[in-house]
Regions:
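PLP-dependent amino-acid enzyme catalytic core
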Residues: 4-378
Length: 378
């Protein structure tokens, strides 16, 4: 049972990165009241030095100084996933070994912890599968009622997992954006906490622990390149936060380049990058088509401007992968003992054939193959 007496740490305020509007801590507001855009957190922590981490909890909560919430009670031991070499200079972080089998647990535990403090009547979320599963699991752990909105065509295995945790599943006709729109409408009801992995900045402050772990795994340094799959950009933006925190604290002397990977079938950000655009607003993007990488099939990500800026500021770039590259990468990883879902192999698909040159890199393997099965041959 959650220990509410431990929840006395003041919450930082949120603000809109577009117009600066501030949203006080402790409210159920999920977006900017003026522009309806996503929020950021007014929080600039200082990470602990490497040697001070010895003996701490073997989970992402070992980086307590960098997290906006303290005294976790909903934890399932998330974080501290293995880092294994795939080939010389390129390693993989096995985030598919999280409690719900995807990296989304990093952010979901922060959202559940926040919801406990705000004490809503209900929690709603939207997802193509993995975020919904993670939020359902952590809401179950926190004993919070939860409804997850998913688009039609979501993997049956992911739907089963969401339901198994006791969440109500609402399948919405249409694509990923249709599911998000339905969840946002529900989120406007009084007493509702919108556990959005896109709009709520607490999620990003959970995903940033991915890079804090890399830094610790690599003995206080980072690779030349951090390769990240991008749909809504939550892992990439979390990575950018962590890099900034480590650099500001003097714990790294150079920032790695962020390489953002999209499916060629749904690649609005890669198109904007190629056009030199700073946002998707007013930009004619190519039509989308079905993709095996359903988890990053986001035609209009709300944080597009932030994603493009983060990649540009890091000296990184965008890469796209074809459906055949995804199939081949999934089988290649399976032949090495790593069974990863089709979305989760996108980064390996992007770099396995030499896109990095001699630079060192880490790719995340974001979701377990059991969630989708092996992609069928073309």
């Amino acid at each position: 049972v959650p220990n509410y007496s431990a929840y006395m740490t003041p919450l930082p305020d949120c603000y809109c990165p577009v117009d600066g509007t501030r949203v006080p801590a402790g409210t159920l507001a999920w977006c900017c009241p003026l522009c309806r855009g996503p929020l950021d957190l007014d929080f600039a922590p200082t990470p602990a030095p490497l040697k001070s981490l010895t003996g701490r909890a073997n989970s992402l909560w070992r980086y307590a100084e960098t997290l906006p919430l303290a005294a976790p009670t909903t934890t399932l031991g998330e974080g501290r996933t293995p880092l294994v070499e795939l080939r010389d200079g390129v390693s993989a972080k096995l985030d598919f070994l999280m409690p719900t089998l995807s990296f989304k647990d990093r952010g979901a535990v922060l959202l559940a912890e926040l919801a406990l403090r705000l004490k809503p009547d209900q929690v709603v979320a939207d997802s193509s599968g993995n975020a919904g599963t993670a939020i359902a699991a952590y809401c179950a752990r926190a004993r919070l009622p939860c409804t997850v909105y998913v688009p039609e065509g979501t993997s049956a295995k992911k739907l089963e997992q969401i339901g198994a945790h006791g969440a109500r599943v609402r399948v919405i006709d249409g694509d990923r954006e249709a599911a998000a729109a339905a969840a946002r409408e529900a989120a406007d009801a009084p007493g509702t906490f919108y556990a959005s992995h896109v709009y709520n900045p607490y999620f990003l402050h959970g995903t940033k622990t991915y890079v804090h772990e890399l830094w610790e795994d690599m003995g206080g340094r980072l690779p030349d390149v951090v390769v990240v799959p991008v749909g809504n950009g939550t892992l990439l933006l979390g990575a950018a936060l962590a890099v900034a925190e480590l650099h500001s604290a003097g714990l790294i002397d150079r920032r790695p380049a962020l390489y953002a990977v999209q499916s060629a079938a749904v690649a609005p950000l890669a198109h904007a990058w190629a056009e030199g655009a700073s946002d998707l607003t007013g930009l004619a993007v190519p039509p989308v088509s079905p993709t095996l990488a359903e988890g990053i099939a986001i035609p209009d990500p709300p944080r597009a401007r932030q994603i493009l800026r983060a990649v540009r500021d890091s000296g990184g770039t965008f890469l796209t992968v074809t459906e055949d590259q995804i199939r081949h990468a999934q089988r290649d990883l399976a032949s090495q003992g790593l069974y990863v879902e089709s979305t989760g192999v996108a980064c390996w698909a992007a770099v396995r054939e030499g896109a990095l040159g001699t630079r060192t890199a880490v790719v995340p393997l974001c979701g377990a193959g059991l969630k989708t099965g092996l992609a069928a041959p073309a």
